[in-house]
């Protein structure tokens, strides 16, 4: 991809997200070496159209194997400005406990929050979350940690998952499920219908006190040719794939809990008297059918109406 191509694609993505009512978006940027890729700088130059945009350096775990290189990567992220996080792609195919140790230590030294792409597999022997839970019990992390995917939790037993979830809750770790991507890619074999859903343990995590969110990890890329930048699509997918209930009153937090994403107490109360409002109004919906049949909307960002999507008329014709 060229820089111009990155600009075009990313700008279109931000415009679509803003029109859907997104005000805070976090993007994983693939790093293939210890040096920042072109996309890292190009995304920083984007007009974010009123969206708070965070960049995560998604680095394959083996690149943290050498402590000096781990420091180089963490320093580069820390020197990239505000709203940058250190991340890692952690899978049984690249597992390295020493690299995990270096990843967490370098993030702590450079005062970076972590966003870990971890255990995206249906393997009972994946070690990412198991190792992290054990490590945190002995070495608390000073910043905030998000763990996305965590599909492997659904492949093991409840007895295996329970102590992991207790440790994640105790250390304020947020667990993010990606229902569209997980349904598409997990238990996938060409010509065979999948048997497993591949969604992490949302209900069990919530019961254990773990902060939970839903996200959309891939939109029209090499891993997922479809998708959208509409959080309501993600929530609707989660409704069916994870059998969620109380969508409007309770589980709507899965797509709008900024504090769960950032770990910042300042984000815990987005509505305050005198503050500028950032809300999405669904004029053709109600709490019983939402998030389905809710495409029409009014987007108010920081007190200003920025987008309006309405149905002018719905016609019924007799045959």
Regions from the PLM with identified roles:
Residues 21, 86, 117, 147, ...:
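Divalent metal-coordination and catalytic microenvironments
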Residues 134-144, 196-282:
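His/Asp/Glu-enriched, well-ordered alpha-helical/loop segment
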Residues 37-55, 111-116, 205:
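Alpha-helix-loop-beta-strand connector modules within alpha/beta enzyme cores
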Residues 10, 14, 40-44, 71-74, ...:
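Generic structural signal for well-ordered alpha-helices
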Residues 1-28, 34-48, 72-78:
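Alpha-helical scaffold segments that flank or form the walls of functional sites
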Residues 253-255, 271-319:
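C-terminal cap of metal-dependent C-N hydrolases
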Residues 54, 58-67, 78-197:
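Active-site core of metal-dependent hydrolases
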Residues 23-24, 84, 211:
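Short acidic/polar active-site loop segments enriched in Thr and Asp
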């Amino acid at each position: 991809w060229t820089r111009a191509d990155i600009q075009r694609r990313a700008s279109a993505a931000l415009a679509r997200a803003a029109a859907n009512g997104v005000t805070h978006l976090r993007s994983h940027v693939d790093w293939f070496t210890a040096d920042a890729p072109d996309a890292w700088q190009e995304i920083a130059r984007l007009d974010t159209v009123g969206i708070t945009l965070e960049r995560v350096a998604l680095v394959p775990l083996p690149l943290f194997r050498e402590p000096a290189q781990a420091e180089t990567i963490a320093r580069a992220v820390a020197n990239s400005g505000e709203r940058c996080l250190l991340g890692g792609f952690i899978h049984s195919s690249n597992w390295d406990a020493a690299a995990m140790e270096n990843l967490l230590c370098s993030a702590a030294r450079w005062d970076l929050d972590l966003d870990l792409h971890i255990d995206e597999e249906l393997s009972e022997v994946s070690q990412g979350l198991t190792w992290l839970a054990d490590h945190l019990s002995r070495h608390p992390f000073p910043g905030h940690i998000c763990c996305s995917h965590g599909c492997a939790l659904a492949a093991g037993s409840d007895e295996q998952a329970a102590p992991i979830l207790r440790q994640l809750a105790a250390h304020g770790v947020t667990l993010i499920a990606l229902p569209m991507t997980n349904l598409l890619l997990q238990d996938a074999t060409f010509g065979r219908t999948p048997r497993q859903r591949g969604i992490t343990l949302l209900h069990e995590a919530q019961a254990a006190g773990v902060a939970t969110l839903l996200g959309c990890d891939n939109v029209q890329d090499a891993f997922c040719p479809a998708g959208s930048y509409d959080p309501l699509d993600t929530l609707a997918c989660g409704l069916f794939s994870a059998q969620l209930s109380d969508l409007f009153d309770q589980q709507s937090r899965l797509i709008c809990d900024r504090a769960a994403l950032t770990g910042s107490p300042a984000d815990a109360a987005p509505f305050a008297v005198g503050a500028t409002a950032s809300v999405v109004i669904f004029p053709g919906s109600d709490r019983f059918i939402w998030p389905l049949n809710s495409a029409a909307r009014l987007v108010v960002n920081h007190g200003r109406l920025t987008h309006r999507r309405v149905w002018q008329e719905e016609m019924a014709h007799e045959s």
